[in-house]
């Protein structure tokens, strides 16, 4: 399962409020994570995409719902390039977001496909 929940950045969007009270956002996320955990197969994985405005709180919440022993990795995704960002928009632009990856149960293993390295890509 891959989810991209509201980042709770304080912005107003047409279809949802991204400026929730912190405790409201945590409650909303806990409810959804608990539901998703019930829906996951025993060998299932969940990837949750977030930025740093709530990323560290989400990590602790996912530790509680899925268990710290089921945490696999936090991936960091570059979403902007500094040299291509309009500087006048804001003083500081976030360039990296996070994806927290958990498994439902300890024995779950990702299915890895063999890469075809028989040709030169470069």
Predicted regions and their residues:
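Core catalytic lobe of class I
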Residues: 1-122
């Amino acid at each position: 399962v891959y989810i991209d929940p509201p980042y709770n950045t304080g912005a107003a969007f047409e279809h949802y409020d991204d400026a929730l009270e912190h405790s409201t956002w945590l409650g909303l996320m806990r409810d959804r994570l608990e539901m998703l955990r019930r829906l996951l197969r025993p060998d299932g994985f969940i990837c949750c995409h977030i930025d740093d405005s709530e990323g560290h709180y989400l990590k602790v919440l996912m530790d509680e719902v899925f268990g710290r022993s089921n945490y696999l990795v936090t991936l960091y995704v570059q979403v902007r390039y500094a040299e291509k960002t309009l500087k006048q928009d804001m003083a500081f632009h976030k360039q990296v977001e996070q994806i927290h990856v958990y498994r439902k149960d300890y024995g779950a293993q990702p299915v890895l496909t063999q890469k075809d390295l028989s040709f030169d890509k470069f």
